[in-house]
Design a protein with these regions (language model features):
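Short beta-strand/loop motif that positions the catalytic acidic residue
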Residues: 112, 118-120, 124
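Serine-hydrolase catalytic machinery in alpha/beta-hydrolase-like enzymes
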Residues: 2-68, 80-83
């Protein structure tokens, strides 16, 4: 099965982010089309950026896309990908370092009941690993915990490889 992947970067990041581009490269090598929306203009508005506008931009990016669709994201990008999956039919979610809640917002991490893979750092200084373990356990999601911090900087290639295994398993 091949389709389209939309990869959402995190706060203080860009479409050229190392994890986003590594995942895009793997997806393309497997025959998937990809896009990485740019949220930098929205992220400059406050400490957490404009979350609701990010969600709306991702929804618009999905309009008219061919299926199957997979959403991937890192940190805030993971959060909005999960939230958008509640409104748009997707085949799967690949979430890296997803926050389970956002300070100052009355929304928590929720996602459609679709195949989901999560990669999270044991030493994440922003989002405690235990919160993500509890969230993933409630959903019986595939969760990989790695010896890394929030940015998963030491596991970029691992994340890309894990993504490749994930999309190859979508059948």
């Amino acid at each position: 099965m091949k389709g389209h992947v939309i990869i959402s970067h995190g706060l203080q990041s860009s479409p050229e982010a190392t994890k986003a581009t590594a995942i895009a490269k793997v997806a393309q090598s497997l025959g998937w089309t990809t896009e990485i929306p740019d949220y930098r203009d929205l992220d400059a508005s406050s400490e957490l950026g404009d979350v609701l506008s990010r969600i709306e931009r991702l929804r618009r990016a999905l309009a008219g896309k061919r299926t199957p669709l997979v959403l991937a994201g890192s940190s805030m990008g993971a959060f909005i990908s999960a939230r958008v999956s509640l409104a748009v039919a997707v085949q799967g979610l690949f979430l890296m370092a997803p926050p389970t809640q956002l300070k100052g917002y009355d929304i928590v991490l929720e996602a459609a009941p679709v195949r989901t893979c999560i990669v999270h750092g044991w030493h994440d200084e922003l989002i405690p690993a235990g919160e993500v373990v509890r969230w993933a356990q409630k959903r019986s999601d595939h969760l990989v915990l790695v010896n890394d911090s929030h940015r998963l900087a030491d596991h970029v290639e691992f994340c890309a490889q894990e993504f490749g295994r994930f999309v190859q398993g979508l059948a």
